[in-house]
């Protein structure tokens, strides 16, 4: 067996954290040294999640303050915004970090403050590479610090980044209607996430006010080399555990056809292990749930010179834990598909 990378998963008992652990357990180059959480110290992960047994992982959950960082190569942070940056400030000089919070995604400190509040270490934000793997592969490979994108931004940016970079779509008037499984709201106990509140109901929330908006707009501006892109964004919770579908409404640049857009996406992602253009599979989350895949479909709009792009991902995998492992693989110069070759759930 080759050298195994020792990792710590901080925030291991949340939905994203436990998905990350599940993936890392199948990674031949990884040894999970520590699992950290605030409320389950001393317990096994199997006491929180029955689908993981003591035979799978016998590491007791510990407090972050009790771990020995000299025995860790990479720390995965599955923590809320604000909490994650506090940890990064302590460990930045010691280990590689893959952060799944929002704390290091937004590069403008004032924009971050407007949407999330004050940042405890804004001077460290520039050290982090935005971890949209298919777009920033080379930067990720060279970096020690990765800020993994949010789930909504992942589903939107995978199709739009190359189209804006290639000047195929207009940068203004972008409309996104996105639907997410309830796991996207996290594991904390809140009334609006109880079974009777979410079952058999579709609920819109934070219309034009979702915290993922500035993250999406930042990357769209980078893609288009502009400073003023604003999009209409409506997030919706749907009564399923996992899965995400974004319907994206776009106006084409003059002289550009639907075929041009589809061929551009096919060419851009021709070597991708996880992003595929397939109209039939892009119309259902069943094609992606349980995987790190993203399926895209390009459809004609009824309004002249418009198109509709459908983008589906698993919000817990390509939208979170799966992309984190993909980034880890790229960072460590491993095959990006290691531990991510799942087939979809039925």
From Swiss-Prot:
GO BP annotations, alphabetical order: L-arginine biosynthetic process
A Pfam entry, by short name: Semialdhyde_dhC_1
UniProt keyword Zinc-finger present: no
Keyword Amino-acid biosynthesis assigned: yes
Bilayer-crossing regions: none
Residues annotated as catalytic: 151
Recorded catalytic activity of this chain's protein: N-acetyl-L-glutamate 5-semialdehyde + phosphate + NADP(+) = N-acetyl-L-glutamyl 5-phosphate + NADPH + H(+)
Gene Ontology MF terms in the entry: N-acetyl-gamma-glutamyl-phosphate reductase activity; NAD binding; NADP+ binding
UniProt keyword list: Amino-acid biosynthesis, Arginine biosynthesis, Cytoplasm, NADP, Oxidoreductase
Function: Catalyzes the NADPH-dependent reduction of N-acetyl-5-glutamyl phosphate to yield N-acetyl-L-glutamate 5-semialdehyde.
Family, similarity comment: Belongs to the NAGSA dehydrogenase family. Type 1 subfamily.
Name of the molecule in the record: N-acetyl-gamma-glutamyl-phosphate reductase
Gene symbol of the encoding locus: argC
């Amino acid at each position: 067996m080759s050298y195994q990378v020792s990792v710590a998963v901080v925030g291991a008992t949340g939905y994203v954290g436990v998905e990350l652990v599940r993936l890392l357990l199948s990674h031949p180059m990884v040894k999970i040294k520590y699992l950290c959480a605030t409320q389950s110290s001393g317990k096994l992960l199997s006491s929180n999640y029955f689908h993981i047994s003591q035979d799978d992982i016998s590491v007791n959950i510990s407090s972050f303050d009790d771990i020995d960082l000299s025995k860790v190569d990479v720390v995965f942070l599955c923590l809320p915004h604000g909490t994650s940056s506090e940890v990064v400030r302590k460990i930045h000089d010691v280990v590689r970090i893959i952060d799944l919070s929002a704390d290091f995604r937004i590069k403008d400190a004032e924009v971050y403050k407007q949407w999330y509040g004050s940042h405890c270490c804004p001077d460290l934000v520039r050290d982090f590479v935005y971890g949209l793997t298919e777009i920033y592969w080379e930067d990720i490979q060279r970096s020690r610090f990765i800020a993994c994108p949010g789930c909504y931004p992942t589903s939107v940016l995978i199709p739009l980044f190359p189209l804006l970079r290639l000047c195929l779509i207009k940068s203004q008037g972008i409309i996104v209607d996105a639907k997410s499984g309830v796991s996207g709201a996290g594991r904390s106990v809140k009334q609006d996430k109880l079974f009777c509140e979410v079952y058999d109901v579709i609920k819109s929330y934070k219309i034009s006010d979702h915290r993922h908006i500035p993250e999406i707009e930042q990357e769209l501006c980078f893609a288009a080399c502009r400073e003023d892109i604003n999009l209409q964004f409506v997030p919706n919770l749907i009564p399923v555990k996992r899965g995400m579908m974004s319907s994206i409404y776009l106006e084409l640049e003059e002289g550009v056809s639907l075929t041009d857009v589809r061929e551009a996406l096919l060419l851009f992602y021709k070597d991708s292990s996880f992003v595929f253009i397939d109209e039939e599979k892009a119309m259902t989350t069943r094609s992606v749930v349980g995987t790190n895949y993203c399926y895209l479909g390009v459809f004609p709009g009824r309004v002249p010179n418009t198109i509709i792009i459908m983008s589906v991902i698993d919000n817990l995998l390509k939208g979170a834990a799966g992309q984190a492992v993909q980034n880890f693989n790229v960072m460590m110069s491993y095959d990006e598909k290691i531990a991510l070759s799942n087939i979809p759930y039925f």
